[in-house]
Amino acid sequence: MSSRTNISCLQEAKRVAIFGGTHGNEMSGIVLANMWIQNATEIERKGLVCKPFITNPRAVEKCTRYIDTDLNRAFTPENLSASELEALPYEVQRAKEINQMFGPKGGSDAYDVIFDLHNTTSNMGSTLILESSTDLFNLQMVHYIKKAMAPHTCSVLLNEHPQLKYSTTRSVAKHPVGLEVGPQPQGVLRSNVFESMRTILKHALDFIELFNNGVEFPPCTVNVFRVQERMDYPRDTNGNITAMVHPHLQDCDWEPLNRGDPMFLTFDGRTILYEGANTVYPTFINEAAYYEKQQAFVTTCREILAANAIRKAFK
């Protein structure tokens, strides 16, 4: 079979949105989106509509994660089809509005690409989040971004877990991409984190412009971390946390956690070891926003995904 046979011809990406403020205290995306709303020169690309947008303005105004419920979990079929006559939480109302503007989710008229900009208090560095292992466009794009960012690291988190995958703000698009850059405290703007996010978006938009101009991207492989399990803190019978992330694990996102390694440190000084059968790679370690979600960290496994060559489909 010739290499030409393996080229996947994909539709041009004509409409791109950049979402900031899905969580109203994650400042890098908020500032970038507002900056580009005022002056979009930096994100303009020939033949491409690129719309910066603040998704949760009330939460941004109050510098809080959300008002009533997490917007980044609100894009379920039930919420998007809820009657306007119902007394809906603010973020559910907002999800319906965003779906009308940038969707409909799963529809042919949805935006081609949505970049949803997030910060984490965890030591994750620059991370791209994907929701599908078969989206050739996104796989080729993150491969391009990772090469452009070198020698700086840009990790790729893949969440296809049937129980742990959630209905994200970006899932409205045909090609949803999350950006998670940290560590950065909530409500704080750090220049290095801000510039990393800005650089990732530049490379992403460059890729889309090249693709739309007919550039063919050869087959590639992408190293990803696949979400496996959510780990909670140890708790007592009343549900109260009884231990902290162990100092040997703290700030060690993406590093191997082996059986027998320290995982938690109880308040009375006892070390709790990891007892899993296989080595895992934790991330979102001690994320501040996830205490309410009963999550100390997420375990992942390493995987290599292969993507066919792609080019724009010519009419």
UniProtKB/Swiss-Prot annotation:
Main EC class of this protein?
hydrolase
Q: Which GO terms describe its molecular function?
A: aspartoacylase activity; hydrolase activity, acting on carbon-nitrogen (but not peptide) bonds, in linear amides; hydrolase activity, acting on ester bonds; metal ion binding
Co-factor requirement: Zn(2+)
Q: Which domain of life is it from?
A: Eukaryota
Species, as recorded: Danio rerio (Zebrafish)
- Give residues annotated as binding substrate: R65, N72, R73, Y166, S167, T168, T169, R170, E180, Y290
Q: How is the cofactor bound?
A: Binds 1 zinc ion per subunit.
Known EC number(s)? Answer: 3.5.1.15
**Which gene codes for it?**
aspa
Q: By its UniProt entry, which Gene3D superfamilies does this protein fall under? A: 2.20.25.160, Zn peptidases
Q: Entry's SUPFAM superfamilies? A: Zn-dependent exopeptidases
InterPro entries named in the record: AspA/AstE_fam, Aspartoacylase, AstE_AspA_cat, Aste_AspA_hybrid_dom
Active-site annotation: E180
Please verify whether the record's keywords include Ribosomal protein: no
Q: What function does the entry list? A: Catalyzes the deacetylation of N-acetylaspartic acid (NAA) to produce acetate and L-aspartate.
Q: What is its main location?
A: cytoplasm
This chain belongs to the protein called Aspartoacylase
Q: Which UniProt keywords apply?
A: Cytoplasm, Hydrolase, Metal-binding, Nucleus, Zinc
GO cellular component term, pick one: cytosol
Q: Which residues bind Zn(2+)?
A: H23, E26, H118
Per the similarity annotation, which family is this?
Belongs to the AspA/AstE family. Aspartoacylase subfamily.
Q: Where in the cell is it found?
A: Cytoplasm; Nucleus
Catalyzed reactions:
an N-acyl-L-aspartate + H2O = a carboxylate + L-aspartate
